[in-house]
Amino acid sequence: MAATEILNRADIVKAPQVRLAPQPEKPSLIGLLRDDIAKLLAEKGVPERQVKMRVSQLWHWLYVRGVSDFDEMSNVSKDMREMLKEHFTIARPDIVEEQVSGDGTRKWLLRFPPRGAGRPVEIETVYIPEEGRGTLCISSQVGCTLTCSFCHTGTQKLVRNLTAEEILSQLLLARDRLGDFPERDTPQGAIVPAEGRKITNIVMMGMGEPLYNFENVKTALLIASDGDGLSLSKRRITLSTSGIVPEIYRTGEEIGVMLAISLHAVRDDLRDMLVPINKKYPLKQLMEACRAYPGLSNARRITFEYVMLKDVNDSLEDAKELVKLLKGIPAKINLIPFNPWPGTNYQCSDWEQIEKFADFINQAGYASPIRTPRGRDILAACGQLKSESERMRKVDRLAFEAMMIANHGED
């Protein structure tokens, strides 16, 4: 088989035998802060003098060792393990499908159990291996309310917010599948960084608007960055928003991770059409929130995402206005060649025009990387994620190029 055929082939891995997702009446300990775990243990009769120690044990097993079965907690007494099994769960979501691109990009379709009177829901999580690092793209909602006109996810109505458990479980499951916990083996065929952690960066850039699910996203990211557990540096966590201005201020004050803005236009009239939330929070308000974001410097910049749409927002005049708009903000501008999907009215800018746009911005003093094509054979690209119930047939999706999220977060 020719090398090009191998690189353009998507390997679909059937769902492995995994522990079934939890029943809704059994609360999960995943996604709970220490104080919340302590309260639950006390309610179940754990003596007050033992609660703090038990919480520390559980935290270590959940987030350092990555176990998904209470019986694996070898330094926890048998009676305690039986109580935990009876009342709680730490199971992972079901893997419906795992797809592996020829370039090593992995996409998981995950199913979470019903919540209340709801139905099971499915979301997608994507892993992008690169030399020296690996980035996990995490979803925050099932569907999206923002209806950005160029985004495939935006054509799927919002079903519900993901819980902190469901957000964090995407990271835990990915680390499981990549052998990224102690004493876990890397799966055969996985393309991962040669040394150190397999997942070094996470980006909240999957399905949904993270800041419309602020509290759950906040809890999940605080746990992910906790130094006694998963221990991801906040400089390696990037939250992307379309511009929910009040929560941008809260993100800086309460979470403190890196910020990315889905900008895509430099004029309010055009951004109103491309990113309708702009009608509520126009560019002036958005830029004020960005300038006020805590800790900005040349080493800690805001990433501005700009999808390149042919004859829509890709002129040199647009580039000039972009430089003017961002004046005074430590920034990096990620240029995203548009990822086509069935039914879209947009086209990707010509490559020559993208390079001219990038050169102008670069000469003005801004880093302006063009996203590297990744996962093009598995529809894993920015703006293309959708749950399986909304998915096109494989023969259709293989007709469309996709470009995987890359170059996000700080090294």
Curated annotation (Swiss-Prot):
Gene Ontology biological process terms, A to Z: rRNA base methylation; tRNA methylation
Enzyme Commission number: 2.1.1.192
Binding site for S-adenosyl-L-methionine: G208, E209, S240, S262, L263, H264, N339
Cofactor binding remark: Binds 1 [4Fe-4S] cluster. The cluster is coordinated with 3 cysteines and an exchangeable S-adenosyl-L-methionine.
Binding site for [4Fe-4S] cluster: C144, C148, C151
Cofactors that this protein relies on: [4Fe-4S] cluster
Intrachain disulfide bonds: C137-C382
Sequence ranges assigned to domain Radical SAM core in this UniProt record: 130-379
Keywords in alphabetical order: 4Fe-4S, Cytoplasm, Disulfide bond, Iron, Iron-sulfur, Metal-binding, Methyltransferase, rRNA processing, S-adenosyl-L-methionine, Transferase, tRNA processing
Reaction(s) catalysed by this chain's protein: adenosine(2503) in 23S rRNA + 2 reduced [2Fe-2S]-[ferredoxin] + 2 S-adenosyl-L-methionine = 2-methyladenosine(2503) in 23S rRNA + 5'-deoxyadenosine + L-methionine + 2 oxidized [2Fe-2S]-[ferredoxin] + S-adenosyl-L-homocysteine; adenosine(37) in tRNA + 2 reduced [2Fe-2S]-[ferredoxin] + 2 S-adenosyl-L-methionine = 2-methyladenosine(37) in tRNA + 5'-deoxyadenosine + L-methionine + 2 oxidized [2Fe-2S]-[ferredoxin] + S-adenosyl-L-homocysteine
Active-site annotation: E124 (proton acceptor), C382 (s-methylcysteine intermediate)
Gene Ontology molecular function, alphabetical: 4 iron, 4 sulfur cluster binding; metal ion binding; rRNA (adenine(2503)-C2-)-methyltransferase activity; rRNA binding; tRNA (adenine(37)-C2)-methyltransferase activity; tRNA binding
Database matches in Pfam families: Radical_SAM, RlmN_N
Alphabetical list of InterPro entries matching this protein: Aldolase_TIM, Methyltransferase_A, RlmN_N, RNA_MTrfase_RlmN, rRNA_lsu_MTrfase_RlmN/Cfr, rSAM
Gene Ontology CC entries for this record: cytoplasm
Record CDD domains: Radical_SAM
Subcellular compartments: Cytoplasm
Extra information: Reaction proceeds by a ping-pong mechanism involving intermediate methylation of a conserved cysteine residue.
Annotated PANTHER family: 23S RRNA METHYLTRANSFERASE (PTHR30544), RADICAL SAM CORE DOMAIN-CONTAINING PROTEIN (PTHR30544:SF5)
Protein purpose: Specifically methylates position 2 of adenine 2503 in 23S rRNA and position 2 of adenine 37 in tRNAs. m2A2503 modification seems to play a crucial role in the proofreading step occurring at the peptidyl transferase center and thus would serve to optimize ribosomal fidelity.
Family: Belongs to the radical SAM superfamily. RlmN family.
Protein name: Dual-specificity RNA methyltransferase RlmN
Organism: Rhizobium meliloti (strain 1021) (Ensifer meliloti)
Encoding gene, per UniProt annotation: rlmN
